[in-house]
Design a protein with these regions (language model features):
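Basic- and hydrophobic-enriched, low-structure N-terminal and domain-boundary segments
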Residues: 1-142, 146-151, 484, 494, ...
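Extended hydrophobic/Leu-rich segments
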Residues: 35-46, 109, 483-487, 503, ...
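Short alpha-helical interface patches
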Residues: 48, 59-112, 207-217, 261-268, ...
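Short, surface-exposed polybasic-aromatic patches that bind anionic ligands, especially phosphate groups
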Residues: 530-531
Length: 597
C-alpha cells in the first residue's frame, strides 16, 4: 500500500509540471516590468489563459517557476507525515456481515457451506480464492453438532465422511440424506453387528500402501503419551506383520485377504523356546514360498523377523499379538473380513459414510484412523488419475477430531486436500486438544484452514488465542481533573488509546447465541449461530419431527484358514458349515501341502 501511495504522488507531481509551465509562459511578458508589473499583469493573463506570447524572458521564467516548483515539492516531501487518524493503536473492527457474505456465497442456498446464520461460503474455491477447510472450536453444549455439523449435512450438496460420536448425526439426518438420493454407509463401532464391513486389504494398490497400513496401525494402537524405551520390539513386530500381509496379498485368494486371516497365520506360528529347530506350520508355509520364489517380498520380511533366537521370536509374536488383540473378537473379525464401503465411490457418487464411535471408549478408534488414511489416498488417487486433480466435492465432518489418531504430516495432507476439492471441518472442544495432538504442527494446521469458527467455551488458552486474532482497536478516552481551594476548577483531557476488540474475559463471556467467525483476509465477524429450525430441509430430520434413521445389520462371514481349493475335498459337509476351526498337525499339513503344490 505504501508503494502505491508513493507512485500516485510521483504521477501527480509530474502532471503538475504542465500547469507550472503554462503559468510561467503567461507571466513571462510581464517579467521585465518588475514586481509591480507582474502583479498587475497576472490578472490580465488569467483573463486570457490561452493568449500565450513567447518573448525573450520565456525560457528564464519557465526555469524559475520549475525551480520554485521543485523546491516546493522537496519541502513537502521532507515534512510529510504519515497519519492514520483513529487507528493510532490498532485498526481492528467487526466486519460487515452482509458484505462479506455477498463476497463468498453462491446465490443458490444449497450450494454453500454454512458457517453462521448469515454467512455461508461457496464450495467453488475459484470463485473466492479461499479454501473450504474449517476449524470449529466449541466447548460442551456450545452447539458444534446442532449449529454446524447438522446444518451442513442438511445441505445435501457433497459426499460426506462423518465422524459421529454416539450416532446422533446419522439418526437425525440419515433419512433426509436417503430422500435426497444418497447411499448411506455406516461403520458402526458401537453396535458392530449393524455395521457395514470394512476390510483395509481391499484398498492396498501397491507395496507402499501395505507399508502405510502397518505404520498407521502401529501408530494408532500406541497409547497417547507413551514412549517405548526399546523400539526393537515394535520394529520386529512390524516386520512380521508385513510378511504376513504381503503373503496374503500375493498368495492368498481375495476372500482370505483380511485381518482375521492374519490372526490365524499368527496363531499358526508356534514358537518353542526350548527347541530352536522346531518348524511351525507358518514356518513351513514360508519355506515352501521361498523354494518357489526366493525373492518374494514376504519371504524377505519373514527371514528378517526370523533371524533371532526362539525366545526373541516368541517376544516378537507376543508384541504383535498385543497390537492386534482386538481382531480376536468375533464382532471385529466379522466386520473386517469383507468390504462394503467402496471408498472410491465417495468421489463419484452421492455417498454419506458415517463412522460411529463410542463417546466413552476409544478402544476401536484405531480402525477409524486407518479408514481416514486410506480414504485420503483413495480420493487423491481418483482426483489425479480420473478428474484432472479436482474431485466432485467431498466434505469430511471430523467431529471429536481429538479422539482419532491421524498421520503426523496431517498439516501437509490438508494442503493437498485444498487442491483436490476436498473440504474438511475439524471440530474440537478447545485449542488445547489440537496442541496435544500436534505439538509442533498445530499452528500449521490452523494456518492451512481459511475459516475458523469459535462457538464459545471455557478453556483459557483458546480465549487468549481468539482475543489476539481479533486484534486491537483505537478508542477515545478522557480524564477528569478537579482542583479545590479559592480558585478551584475542573479540567477534561481527551486522548486515544488501544484495547483489544474483545479481551480474553470478554471472549469467555460470549453470548451462547453468537459465534465469532474468521475468514482469511477479512475482518472478524460476530454473528448468530445457524438456527437449524430455519433450514428448508429440517422437516426431513428429527429436529423437524421427521422419523429417525435406523441402520440394520449387513450379511457377512469371516473367512476360515485355507491353503487352497483342494483343501475343501478334505473336509466334510458338516465341517464346511461349521464356524469352528482347528490348526492341523504337522503331518496333516504336510500331506495337504504336498497335494496343493
Amino acid at each position: 500500500m505504501k508503494n502505491d501511495d508513493e507512485q500516485s504522488s510521483l504521477i501527480l507531481a509530474v502532471i503538475g509540471i504542465i500547469p507550472v509551465i503554462w503559468f510561467a509562459l503567461l507571466v513571462a511578458p510581464y517579467l521585465s516590468s518588475g514586481l509591480m508589473g507582474i502583479l498587475e499583469g497576472v490578472p490580465e493573463a488569467m483573463n486570457h489563459p490561452f493568449s500565450i506570447q513567447l518573448c525573450g524572458d520565456s525560457v528564464k521564467t519557465v526555469l524559475i517557476f520549475l525551480l520554485a516548483y521543485g523546491m516546493g515539492i522537496g519541502i513537502y516531501l521532507s515534512t510529510k507525515k504519515h497519519y492514520r487518524r483513529g487507528e493510532e493503536h490498532g485498526s481492528a473492527k467487526w466486519g460487515n456481515v452482509k458484505k462479506i457474505n455477498r463476497r463468498y456465497r453462491e446465490k443458490r442456498f444449497t450450494k454453500n457451506k454454512l458457517l453462521t446464520m448469515h454467512v455461508r461460503i461457496s464450495y467453488n474455491m475459484r470463485k473466492h480464492l479461499r479454501n473450504v477447510l474449517t476449524v470449529v472450536i466449541g466447548g460442551s453444549g456450545s452447539g458444534k453438532t446442532r449449529f454446524f455439523a447438522k446444518p451442513n449435512l442438511m445441505q445435501a450438496n457433497t459426499s460426506f465422511v462423518v465422524l459421529d460420536p454416539k450416532g446422533e448425526n446419522l439418526r437425525d439426518t440419515g433419512y433426509l440424506l436417503e430422500e435426497k438420493g444418497y447411499e448411506v454407509r455406516v461403520l458402526d463401532l458401537i453396535n458392530m453387528e449393524k455395521s457395514h464391513c470394512y476390510n483395509p486389504f481391499v484398498y492396498l494398490k501397491d507395496d507402499n500402501d501395505v507399508q502405510r497400513l502397518v505404520t498407521n496401525l502401529f501408530k494408532a494402537t500406541t497409547p497417547k503419551g507413551s514412549q517405548s524405551n526399546d523400539p526393537f520390539w515394535d520394529t520386529a513386530a512390524s516386520m512380521l506383520l508385513l510378511a504376513l500381509i504381503f503373503y496374503l496379498r500375493y498368495e492368498a485368494p481375495e476372500e482370505e485377504q483380511n485381518f482375521p486371516m492374519v490372526m490365524e497365520m499368527l496363531r499358526a506360528g508356534e514358537v518353542r523356546e526350548d527347541d530352536d529347530q522346531y518348524q511351525s506350520p507358518l514356518d513351513e508355509l514360508f519355506e515352501r514360498l521361498e523354494m518357489k520364489n526366493p525373492e518374494h517380498i514376504a519371504v524377505k520380511y519373514y527371514k528378517d523377523y526370523h533371524s533371532g533366537s526362539a525366545k526373541t521370536l516368541k517376544s516378537i509374536q507376543i508384541t504383535l499379538a498385543a497390537r492386534l488383540e482386538k481382531f480376536n473378537l468375533s464382532s471385529l473379525a466379522a466386520l473386517t473380513a469383507t468390504d462394503d464401503l467402496d471408498l472410491p465411490s465417495l468421489g463419484e457418487r452421492k455417498v454419506a459414510l458415517f463412522a460411529l464411535i463410542p463417546d466413552n471408549d476409544t478402544s476401536y478408534n484405531f480402525l477409524v484412523s486407518i479408514l481416514y488414511t486410506q480414504l485420503f489416498q483413495q480420493l487423491f488417487y481418483l482426483a489425479d488419475h480420473k478428474y484432472g486433480g479436482r474431485l466432485p466435492v467431498v466434505h469430511f465432518l471430523m467431529d471429536e477430531f481429538a479422539n482419532v489418531s491421524l498421520p503426523d504430516d496431517f498439516d501437509k495432507i490438508l494442503s493437498v486436500m485444498r487442491s483436490r476439492e476436498v473440504s474438511v471441518s475439524i471440530i474440537l472442544q478447545n485449542l488445547a486438544q489440537l496442541k496435544a495432538l500436534f505439538e509442533k504442527q498445530w499452528e500449521s494446521i490452523m494456518g492451512n484452514c481459511d475459516e475458523f469458527l469459535y462457538l464459545g467455551g471455557n478453556e483459557q488458552g483458546t480465549h487468549k488465542y481468539v482475543s489476539e486474532l481479533l486484534g486491537k482497536a483505537t478508542i477515545d478516552t478522557n480524564t477528569y481533573g478537579k482542583s479545590t481551594g479559592h480558585s478551584g476548577n475542573y479540567s477534561t483531557n481527551y486522548q486515544n488509546t488501544g484495547r483489544e476488540l474483545m479481551t480474553p474475559d470478554e471472549v469467555r463471556m460470549l453470548d451462547n447465541r453468537y459465534a465469532i467467525l474468521f475468514i482469511r483476509g477479512e475482518r472478524p465477524i460476530l454473528d448468530e449461530k445457524f438456527d437449524i429450525l430455519k433450514h428448508p430441509n429440517v422437516g426431513f430430520t428429527t429436529d423437524g419431527n421427521g422419523k429417525p434413521y435406523l441402520h440394520g445389520a449387513v450379511d457377512r462371514a469371516v473367512a476360515s484358514i485355507s491353503l487352497g481349493d483342494s483343501l475343501e475335498g478334505e473336509l466334510t459337509d458338516d465341517a464346511l458349515e461349521s464356524e469352528d476351526y482347528e490348526l492341523l498337525s504337522d503331518e496333516d499339513l504336510e500331506e495337504i501341502i504336498q497335494k496343493y503344490v
